[in-house]
Amino acid sequence: MTRPDNEPARLRSVAENLAAEAAAFVRGRRAEVFGISRAGDGDGAVRAKSSPTDPVTVVDTDTERLLRDRLAQLRPGDPILGEEGGGPADVTATPSDRVTWVLDPIDGTVNFVYGIPAYAVSIGAQVGGITVAGAVADVAARTVYSAATGLGAHLTDERGRHVLRCTGVDELSMALLGTGFGYSVRCREKQAELLAHVVPLVRDVRRIGSAALDLCMVAAGRLDAYYEHGVQVWDCAAGALIAAEAGARVLLSTPRAGGAGLVVVAAAPGIADELLAALQRFNGLEPIPD
């Protein structure tokens, strides 16, 4: 039986509050580090991570530290897996009565560095490797997307709380599709080859630059579908649940060794089979190693 403090609704509330607090922190720190617009590298505030084109900033690490400190106060003893600070290597091995918090302090760091208003704080609560609650704060828009298993998906903004539903599109040719690209040259080449096959099949394609926001846009009906290779669990832990609870069909590949990351697909139900068949036809459901 689920402990009362592990009920999805309660975990969602924790995630929503933390995401909103962290988003406010990110907005303030960005102004301190970069000024009103991008100013160089913020005097050394940006460094490379997995490749020269994969940045991490002092604000990423500061924000994750804030979230870890808050969770230590609110949920002492809960394991934490964060993009910058690491955590359990296998979240599925966590005891069934324990919640693991999966954190991405800034999803869309390149956008953040350049001052493009599409980056997010993502917080997922997982039990046995399955997300049961989560929240994604769109930092620049000052909105929070959230969901809990069986309780639907919602958007909270200055006007209140709104139920999210994905679109009713039923033809792939009329779908607005989101996607993203990895950081390694090899991965990008393979992704570009696949995209060349997919573009003629859809209405148009958007590259937002944040997997968490892409998934939330599917939930909100601002995209009809989204797919991407090389996604990490912290990128999609919250967003995938939000899309699913809004009615989207969501596919997450099984993690594999070798650093390939996950294949993530989310689509309005009326086009999901058609999109999955198209991706399968061009070998687009297989992970792409870095």
From Swiss-Prot:
GO terms for molecular function: inositol monophosphate 1-phosphatase activity; magnesium ion binding. It catalyses: a myo-inositol phosphate + H2O = myo-inositol + phosphate. It comes from the Bacteria. InterPro entries: IMPase, Inositol_monoP_metal-BS, Inositol_monophosphatase-like, Inositol_monophosphatase_CS. Catalyzes the dephosphorylation of inositol 1-phosphate (I-1-P) to yield free myo-inositol, a key metabolite in mycobacteria. Is also able to hydrolyze a variety of polyol phosphates such as glucitol-6-phosphate, inositol 2-phosphate (I-2-P), glycerol-2-phosphate, and 2'-AMP, albeit with reduced efficiency. It comes from Mycobacterium tuberculosis (strain ATCC 25618 / H37Rv). This is Inositol-1-monophosphatase SuhB. Magnesium. Co(2+) and Fe(2+) can replace Mg(2+) but lead to a partial activity (30%), and Mn(2+) leads to a partial activity of 13%. Mg(2+) 1 binds at residues 83, 104, 106. Substrate binds at residues 83, 106-109, 206, 235. Mg(2+) 2 binds at residues 104, 107, 235. The keyword Transmembrane helix does not apply.
